[in-house]
Curated annotation (Swiss-Prot):
Protein's name in the database: Salivary protein Tsal2A
Lineage: Eukaryota, Metazoa, Ecdysozoa, Arthropoda, Hexapoda
Cofactor: a divalent metal cation
Disulphide bridges, residue numbers: none
Activity at various pH: Active from pH 5.5 to 11.0.
């Protein structure tokens, strides 16, 4: 009898804790690319919602501020840019009794890239955040960006893969690239990409044209949209602050391969992975003559020679660095190895990693990589090797 009494008390206590709580469920409450941006308000604290868990529970008194950012945008229900949902009973509702799952914007919410007061790359660059401006105030970040504020070629981005919600992400589709910080600069970059073959028509490598129908520069996302859950957050990855010029067959080859492997691993382990992705050194056809999209003597949008991706399990702190040679013409790519290749130790057996046209790729320990390339923050902590 005493045991039964104890169980009844426990059940009653648990039910009392649940009463009044509300939750956001992925994907039910954030369907479609027109889902609004969600800010979570607890007391005086307002934060951008991050879709880390399939179900995120909030205490009584929590409010959600829904926003449809971007010029001319607004909620389909009332045309307003923002509305507030309160936790009533066990679900979030507006004053008009609208539910979160029924709310959508007239068009996709637009993100912006905002400069912070922090510095990066050994204090050479500013750190930026991708996020949203709501009622004149910035909320971030969807991901972080370290770059010079003009062109992304030697900086890096920092993002997360949420393994517990990754399989519920909005399906990918291509969007137009843009520059939220300088729209004209975005248009200029569009033109540089579109007219590249004409610009480089006289540039040869190994006696052949540098660019042709198979080998050309594409807009390479450092933080990939395939790692992002919601529509508005995905669109933010098309900002040119997140784009580096990479050879198309390499970006679609091994760079895509290990990113996809990593996303699937996060899903399998239901883990959260932290990523740092960047480029370094400049691609050259002739020594000391770096190649840039503008094909100028001193290019402003340089093509990186290498692309790297550091992946760290946020719980175990195990990590690995993928390093890809962004040069489909290199005749002896192994001579460019920056560290000991430990792919086999990480249970990675990808024959295409040695295919130079798909991007010659090796795996490095973080310590080995960090001894050669000192671009990342010094406070990154990696304990062991992340195995696949």
């Amino acid at each position: 009898m005493s045991l039964l009494y104890g169980l009844l008390i426990l059940a009653f206590t648990r039910s009392c804790l649940v009463v009044g709580q509300c939750s956001i469920n992925i994907p039910d409450d954030l369907k479609g690319e027109e889902a609004p941006v969600i800010l979570v308000k607890t007391g005086n604290n307002v934060k951008l919602f991050r879709p880390e868990e399939k179900t995120t529970t909030f205490p009584k008194g929590t409010e959600l501020l829904l926003a449809c950012t971007g010029e001319g945008n607004g909620l389909k229900s009332n045309g307003q840019e923002t509305t507030t949902l309160s936790c009533n009973g066990n679900q979030f509702e507006s004053a008009a009794k609208e539910k979160l799952k029924d709310m959508s914007c007239k068009s996709m919410a637009k993100a912006v890239v905002e400069q912070t007061t922090k510095r990066c790359m050994g204090n050479d660059f500013n750190l930026y955040e991708a996020g949203y401006k709501v009622n004149g105030k910035f909320y971030g970040s969807v991901y972080d960006i370290c770059y010079n504020g003009k062109g992304q070629s030697s900086g890096y981005t920092h993002n997360f893969i949420y393994g517990r919600t990754w399989k519920y992400k909005l399906p990918e589709k291509p969007y137009e690239h843009y520059s939220s910080r300088d729209p004209q600069a975005g248009k200029d970059l569009d033109k540089l990409y579109k007219e590249q073959k004409e610009r480089f028509k006289n540039t040869k490598v190994n006696g052949k044209p540098l660019l042709d129908d198979e080998h050309y520069f594409t807009e390479g996302q450092l933080t990939p949209d395939t790692s992002i859950i919601t529509g508005a957050d995905k669109l933010s990855t098309y900002d040119y602050a997140n784009i580096a010029p990479l050879f198309k067959d390499i970006y679609d080859g091994n760079i895509w391969r290990y990113e996809n492997m990593t996303q699937e691993l996060a899903d399998q382990r239901q883990a959260t992975f932290e990523e740092y992705t960047g480029g370094f050194y400049s691609y050259e056809v002739e020594k000391w003559k770096p190649i840039g999209l503008d094909n100028a003597e001193f290019p402003t949008h340089r093509v990186p020679k290498y692309i790297y991706k550091l992946v760290v399990d946020t719980e175990s702190k195990d990590g690995i660095v993928f390093v890809t040679l962004n040069d489909p013409y290199h005749k002896s790519p192994a001579s460019e190895n920056l560290c000991k290749d430990i792919c086999s130790e990480a249970n990675i057996n990808e024959p295409d990693f040695k295919n130079v046209e798909k991007g010659y790729t090796i795996c490095c320990s973080y310590g080995d990589f960090g001894n050669r390339i000192r671009t990342l923050p010094k406070d990154i902590h990696v304990k062991g090797l992340l195995k696949y």
